Regions:
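His/Glu-rich zincin catalytic helix
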Residues: 5-7, 18-134, 159-166, 170-177, ...
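Sec-dependent signal peptide recognition
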Residues: 2-10, 14
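Acidic/histidine-enriched alpha-helical segments
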Residues: 89-92, 184-200
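Gly-rich Lys/Arg/Thr-decorated short loops/hinges at beta-loop-alpha junctions or inter-strand turns
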Residues: 219-224
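Catalytic zinc-binding patch centered on the HExxH motif and its immediate surroundings
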Residues: 30-32, 39-41, 144-154
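Short acidic/His-enriched helical or mixed secondary-structure segments at domain edges of catalytic enzymes
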Residues: 194-213
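Short, glycine-/polar-rich solvent-exposed loops and beta-turns at beta-strand/coil boundaries
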Residues: 65, 152-155, 191, 206
Length: 224
């Protein structure tokens, strides 16, 4: 137990030192829309590393929908009404029908009814897919020279990040603002499998279990 306490203290101290170091040269801006922008310039580097962090994560999930924050992280890679849309006006009715069917699914506990709704969702999803592609977001980022495109979800933060040439700053901002302002949750059902695969992968990781056990003791009765 003593060893665990010392380890935890060492982790906190190293994180504090890292934060203190990173404050040097950091400029913070507050935009009119409430968004906070932090800029740390390094003119020795040709690329920009951009992070968009949202102060929301697993601790904000409803108790009956655990994993929702991580799932939302995945869905924000599926495009918008512009990105990934081959014909949004034709896709839109099917997309709205899928949302309506999911709402109906959530309101019933009858298994036969749920099976029927799942079938209808599948059919509507197949039709919607005829007018869209989920690869456009990655294609656009690749086109501006982006690398390391990824995201992660923690207990109280969701972060989307990648690097890109400084000359393409405006294009990167345009792509990222569109994904956050006007997302379309395409391939909603299929993406569930990817999320479950990630979950199962981490279940085989020893440190995942160590962290969960530690947090259950440190944050008993808390969403952490």
């Amino acid at each position: 137990m003593k060893r665990m306490i010392l380890l935890s203290m060492a982790m906190v101290m190293s994180m504090t030192m890292l934060f203190a170091q990173s404050r040097e040269g950091l400029t913070e801006y507050k935009l009119d829309n409430g968004l906070t922008v932090m800029l740390w310039e390094d003119h020795d580097q040709p690329d920009v590393t951009g992070y968009v962090a949202v102060r929301a994560g697993a601790m904000d999930e409803p108790a009956e929908y655990t994993g929702l924050a991580h799932y939302l992280e995945h869905m924000l890679f599926k495009g918008t009404q512009k990105i990934g849309a081959l014909d949004w006006e034709k896709e839109k009715p099917f997309y709205e029908e899928i949302i309506r069917l999911y709402d109906e699914y959530a309101e019933t506990t009858d298994e036969a009814k749920r099976a029927e709704l799942t079938k209808k969702i599948n059919e509507a999803s197949i039709e919607a897919a005829k007018y869209s592609t989920v690869e456009d977001f990655f294609v656009l980022l690749d086109g501006i020279g982006a690398t390391g495109v990824n995201a992660y979800t923690s207990y109280d933060m969701t972060c989307y990040h990648n690097s890109f040439p400084a000359t393409n700053m405006y294009k990167w901002l345009t792509i990222f603002s569109d994904r956050l302002i006007d997302p379309v949750f395409r391939t909603f059902q299929a993406e569930l499998e990817n999320v479950f695969e990630e979950y199962n992968m981490y279940q085989d990781d020893v440190m995942t279990h160590v962290r969960h056990n530690l947090y259950s003791k440190l944050y008993a009765g808390h969403p952490y």
